[in-house]
From Swiss-Prot:
GO CC, any one term: ribosome
Lineage: superkingdom: Bacteria
A molecular function (GO) term: structural constituent of ribosome
Coiled coil region boundaries: none
Record gene name: rplT
Family assignment from sequence similarity: Belongs to the bacterial ribosomal protein bL20 family.
Natural source organism: Variovorax paradoxus (strain S110)
Protein name: Large ribosomal subunit protein bL20
PANTHER family: 39S RIBOSOMAL PROTEIN L20
Family matches, as CDD domains: Ribosomal_L20
Length: 119
């Protein structure tokens, strides 16, 4: 059986890791040993933060809805309760967008919610 030399595969593997580490600061971007660790850590952060992103955006939407509804005299919890009672099925993402970009439409939604809460 002939001897297998690993130079080509090792070079390819190193190139792949260094390509993933492109743009990293200092030796993390150009020394294989350090770049390999940095790429693995970056992958862990990416995996974790893809899940965290969903929570962070939901928090942002709720904060925006809360701020807009407080300007119109309701807390977020009152608004959320009223919107459920009013049967308005708009998700938080859309409500936050409406609250930021179309204040008149959001005010209309809040009026409907207030009417349902008063009834």
């Amino acid at each position: 059986m002939p001897r297998v030399k690993r130079g080509v595969t090792a070079r390819a593997r190193h190139k792949k890791v260094l390509a993933l580490a492109k743009g990293f600061r200092g030796r993390r971007g150009n020394v294989f040993r350090i770049a390999k660790q940095a790429v693995m850590k970056a992958g862990q952060y990416a995996y974790r933060d893809r899940r965290t992103k969903k929570r962070v955006f939901r928090q942002l939407w709720i904060a925006r809805i809360n701020a807009a509804s407080r300007e119109l005299g309701l807390t977020y919890s009152q608004f959320a309760n009223g919107i459920r009672k009013a049967g308005i099925e708009i998700d938080r993402k859309m409500l936050a967008d409406i609250a930021v970009h179309d204040k008149a439409a959001f005010a209309g939604i809040v009026e409907q919610v207030k009417a349902k809460l008063a009834a």
